[in-house]
Every structure is written in C-alpha cells, then in structure tokens.
C-alpha cells in the first residue's frame, strides 16, 4: 500500500493555533508541529490587525496605505482618533453631525460598511465641536458657544499679528501630529533593533530634536 502524506505550512495567531491543536489532539492521522520563535523563521510573519470594535472600520485606511510590519506598531487607533478629531474640528455642527452619526450608524449596522462606521465616529466629534462652536445646521445664533465662534475669534501671534484662532490652533495641532509620528518611528526602529535609524533618521531622534527645538523656539 502506498501512503499519501500532505504537508501544510503557514502562519496562525496564537489563539487560533491553540484552538486548532485542541481540535486535532484526538486525531492520530494528523501530526502538528508548532514553532513560536520568530528568529527561526525563514520569512517574516504576516501582519494581522487586532483592534477594538470601535476602531475596526478605520483599518480600511491603514490597509489602503500599507500594513505595518510584524514588529511595528498598529497605527489604527491613532488614525481613528486624529481623523475623527480633525473632521469634527473642521465640520463642527450639532445638527449635521447628528445626521452623520445616525446615518452612518444605520448603514454600518445594516450594510456592515467600514466607511459608514468611520462617518458615524466622525459625526460624534462633529456634534461635540458643534457645541464648542455653538453651531446648529449652520446657524450660530441658536446655541451659545461653549468655546469660541470660529469665524470671529482672533488672537495675537508674535511677529505675525492678529490671526484667526482656529487657524493658529490647526497649525499647532499639525505640529503635534508630526512630533507624535516621529515618536512612533523611533518606537518601530527600536522594535526592529535598528539602533542607527532610531537615532539618526530624519524622522527619528535627530529629527525630533531638530523639529522640536524649532517648535519650542516659535512657541516661545
């Protein structure tokens, strides 16, 4: 008699691997060998994103620009928070934000559309900033602004003069995002044991010190 053997090799998450091992433990015809040491692998492990349900829809954007490597940080949560925050700051309106939230939530629950989930999250931030701005369906005299009126609020900027407050805050927030991204790059370099890149890359420690000093100088 000729015996036929099938050999299957692949990657599994630890949770799935343990479940698979449990399923086949009583099958004498199946022999399973598991290796959890990445150093022995000839190829780099694939990346599987794992995020809370609230951030799941934003994985679409991460996959669009390329998945992080196995040892790198998953930026989904950061993308979700910053995207929703920036959208809300730009489109702050209680009424319209509420429509986006409800419409997005309905489509996400019924059609399971990732984009609808993103719109729903953005709608929540839009409502929040709508209260901050005192805007309701474009009318700014219905609600009292908790924070400021975007079109009228001005502030003094050294060496420049008076500028719109929202414009100045947007620039400051953009600088903050750049600094955070540099920190992420440093963390990824350390995880990949690339010390040279962590210290001397333009988006690592060297760039962080240079850019951070400029930001502090301008701020002071």
Task: Please annotate each region the language model reported.
Residues 1-20:
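Coiled-coil termination/hinge junctions
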Residues 18-220:
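Conserved, carboxylate-rich catalytic/transport cores that coordinate ions
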